[in-house]
From Swiss-Prot:
It comes from the Eukaryota. It comes from Drimys granadensis. This is Large ribosomal subunit protein bL33c. The keyword Plastid applies. Belongs to the bacterial ribosomal protein bL33 family. The gene is rpl33.
Amino acid sequence: MAKGKDVRIRVILECTSCVRNDLNKESRGISRYITQKNRHNTPSRLELRKFCPYCYKHTIHGEIKK
């Protein structure tokens, strides 16, 4: 039958270089992606290389809390 909690959860990935540059006001915004992860296979925070339209390059996007 059904388990207690859903295994797949929605996570938000945020550009780490835009967050650092936001202190200097160099970037126009912060790039964010919404994706899913399996809670059992990936219990730690997710980090992926994604394209950032504000930095104009591929950067590390890390998981943030909702």
